[in-house]
């Protein structure tokens, strides 16, 4: 609405008037047709009518109206009277100054601020009124007892009613309290929303951190794979480059049956005649002070041509091992040794490393050692440390002779360039970049980033990664190390512009953004599944041991070799990682002696081989042993009393009845006797609590096994990483070596790419590898390794397993020497299963059937005398992850859960394993509205459709109430109703448990308060029977069993009645 015309001083131009309200324009708006109206007038009109008020055009919307600023400024310069002119104000001001005048005008209306006085006065008269004339002004406090303020009007009237005043005051306080409560609730609601928002942000940040960790782990895995290819070229240099080689003939003699060196290489198989440049048998390692390390002996990288006249130039790895094993002394070995090129070079006495904060020496051997570094387990990133020193065990060779055309191959890789700007506040701040470079005369003179300080400027920037190559610094192309050192250590520059290059990653990381929440859940479940697999491997070892005890004619090949010197293959056990650089053969003798004297503390040897994806990978050979000085009492960190307690608990609930093919539970003998012991009620209560606890553990284990089965089906492909390591074989007579070729290992879990149970480390400080427990090895498949009742009754037959069986790893333990060995996987036993490796696989001897009723009797004694029990860990054994992971099974509760889960699943294995369910992709919606894709069984959709179809059919069958009754047709329960039933059942079970616990607590309190002597069951029964001794023998509460057991006795023990009891059996 506009301004009134009579308020303006003087005449107003008609063009400044609104055509709707006929007043002076207030905030004028113009239409597209040129008419001008007040904003308060034209907006309601356009919204309601949808046209111009002048009816000059068609449809009009509010968006088409525009402000007329020049006209508005012209109107604001008009003189206008004060709005309170009627109250006595005679001021005339400019329209644009009117709001400021109204705020301080003395004639503006104002209300008295005293409570109870609502008089409206002029602003200039309010203060005088409140001070002198207001009847509601306070003049003191009531002296009659209420103590409330007394107003001037009440004092003039002679006082006030205290009760009425107190009630009014109380009502005012309650109203204020209610307002405060309401405000408090609003603030609490606002704070709760804020807290949820912050928690969500924190969770998102943690999730992003975990995803970043996984992303860098994948990148590190790719770098390790690329460096593996370099190390393979170093181990087997390509020919055809005109290297200088010379042929040498050496004579070796065994020292205690050992030659003291390792070999690698050989043709992949006997049938493969496509010779490649990497064929040949090479010396990979030489033991210090061994026969091969003497003067005039072998050297690393020597190629073995003949052994005692037997040509090994085109032999396989197994043929070379057999040749050294069967060779008679003296052993004449002909080798080809490469000599350095005749050119000038500077030996790398000291390699350079430049860091703007610290300086550390780093050599080419450190870079090559990165191929053996293990990546951290998700989601925790443990930084690895480069070793401080790495002594060279052989003379210097030109690296270009070994690497060959690797630089040209790397040049062909696609590079990703990125420019990074780093700023520091002063010259004392450190960039935190540790760069490394080669100091020998090679072609690659690049500068690489090897480490980033986590608290530095570069780490906070986040764009620079380890392994990046620095191309330019501040626009200057880096040509050599001197330029890089000068530019990075310059104190004048505070701004650094780095141009870095890195290979483009070929990994598809889109799945991580789409399904990262479910994938992180799978990480945790995968760790739990790994623990379950390890527990089930223990159970499998117990069953295999029991089978071996009962099958006298069957002998394990690994058992025959467990106490012989052929473990070192005649070539020598050259891995010093478990013996701290001591002689391998002497320790073998000591192990044999210990094993013969202490069967439970014998040698424990784990040997496995690996199939790699590359057919040109060279096989390595090595062995590792666990010391024989740890007995069964110091192997797993569980106290003796805890083991005994849970052993009894498992005997109570988890033992399998031998005569029952379905494996039903039944209580064992020792605890049955304890249950019937009448000496103490506390004993019965304790046994009852343990029984309830065991039932709860059983339920938890079944639920966990079911969840892991579902997760395994959903994320089958998500956790399988490419493994590009060496195939590793033992040079010992390990005939079980080929039976484990499908045991894969994750690159991030192995410090040396070797598939023996422990690493082929260059020193005893290296971290060993551990076996991968793949998500494909579900609990259901792992349970198939345990003999269950079937029509065949045998373990080794493929008919007992379905086609869904994939990779099953079982461990057997020899009862004489306690040597755990591996039995072959089902992939080898199944003739229909395709083999992915060219390596030949040996069969696993004869097998005998093991019935499932042996599970309970075999499990309990073995668990009691298990060699994996207490944590007295030798110092040299603490370096092995595979050893330590067995040690870390500290909780007997988890062990009991695994066993009970196994027993419960064995019931269903008598029938053939069903094939894998068909899956389909489903789009799911999270609570935050984001979408993700996951796999779901087709069976769920079919069942849902079938349920709907049944419901439709039944709803239209007939109108006869009797025909559609639940007694005849049954009732269909929907999914929601079934969920409600489960909730009710859980609530009822919880109430029953609570009532039982309350009753037991009440009994305990009554017994504690009762000072009389506790009577046993017999005395209570006698007392009950003799209450009515003179009336009748039987009462309503006596049973026939009580009468037969106790007779009719008085409390003093004398027999009162001797009635005749006749029992008729129908």
Curated annotation (Swiss-Prot):
The modification Phosphoserine is found at residue 427. Gene3D superfamilies: 2.30.42.10, Zinc/RING finger domain, C3HC4 (zinc finger) (3.30.40.10). Disulfide bonds: none annotated. Pathway: Protein modification; protein ubiquitination. One of its GO terms (molecular function) is ubiquitin-protein transferase activity. The RING-type zinc finger domain is required for E3 ligase activity. A zinc finger (RING-type) spans 18-56. SUPFAM superfamilies: PDZ domain-like, RING/U-box, TRAF domain-like. This is E3 ubiquitin-protein ligase PDZRN3. Widely expressed, including in the heart, skeletal muscle and liver and, at lower levels, in the brain, colon, small intestine, placenta and lung. Down-regulated in ovarian serous papillary tumors. One of its GO terms (biological process) is protein ubiquitination. It holds the Pfam family PDZ. Auto-ubiquitinated.
